[in-house]
Amino acid sequence: MGGMLYKLFASASLLTLGLYHLVCTFFHVIKSPQSYAAKPFYPLPRVSGNNNNNRLQKLPLIILILSLSVAFLHQTLISFYSDPLVKGSTPVHRFSSLNSAAVFFLFLLVAVYLLLSESASSLIPLPSDLLFALASGGFFLHYSAATASAAIQTSDLQAHCDSLSARVSALCSLLCLLLACRPRLFVADAALAASVCLQGLWQLQTGLSLYVDGFIPEGCHRLLDVSGGVGGSTQCDIQESKLRAVSVLDLMFTVHVVLVVILLFVTYTMVAMAAGVRRTGSYEALPNNSSDSSNHIQMKSLTGTQA
């Protein structure tokens, strides 16, 4: 039950963060495409004359810090639990959990510094390209930690889930690196937000496939260490059942990718409608000044006379 609750929390946090970043990215590129540049953090809009709203501008960043704190504490606490159901038993589980906790602590340090630099005038805010570079390193470390976690699992399903999660983290790392070098690359910014949403959906699917009996693939069962009373994730004893379960997970991952693409289309449409953008037919560009306007009209008249 604890594993499923944590997966639900991680899924909700990542989906909220990714969707918020996606909405802000679309809004800024639609409203001011010429001055658009990717930002690691978008504060809530400022409302003139509303002090309470202005104080809540950093609410998304505060929620991110709280989520990272919970993730860091969770990985730290479970490192003290025994887990004989992984390769290498409890010592390997302990170091693997501490490795994940260290990655979350890195993200937490960056988020806390960003909050303090936005609030206190004594701290100089870090440039956006440096923040994206740090995020790229953090996502790469998470990719490394997830890959190492997949390697020590005796559960083939959990190993495959961790492997797919690692690939999403590797994609996020690459996109952050691109944004550090090309901050005006809108496609990379939108893809980064979509990848975070995909990671959130995959965390939910991982929890359902490993810890909820109704979603466990056919022919698989929960692991249990009877002597230690330790429950693990899902294991398939028969090779045919394992291959079928892995194929089901691959299919579900593709379904989640399709859902994220649909979410991207819907979000862009709704943001464009909220920003007042409407689809129009073809038009001829208007001249910029009055002299160009008179020349434009004269050319039109001359063309009509010649015809």
Label for each model-derived stretch:
Residues 36-48, 224-235, 278-307:
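Non-transmembrane, juxtamembrane loop and terminal tail segments
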Residues 125-128, 132-135, 145, 157-234, ...:
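Eukaryotic polytopic
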Residues 19-33, 211, 261-284:
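Transmembrane-helix exit/juxtamembrane "anchor" motif
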Residues 8-22, 61-74, 97-113, 129-148, ...:
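Hydrophobic alpha-helical cores of multi-pass transmembrane domains in eukaryotic membrane proteins
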Residues 1-5, 37-59, 84-99, 149-163, ...:
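Juxtamembrane membrane-interface segments at transmembrane-helix boundaries in membrane proteins
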Residues 19-36, 76-84, 208-218:
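Juxtamembrane interfacial secondary-structure elements that flank transmembrane helices
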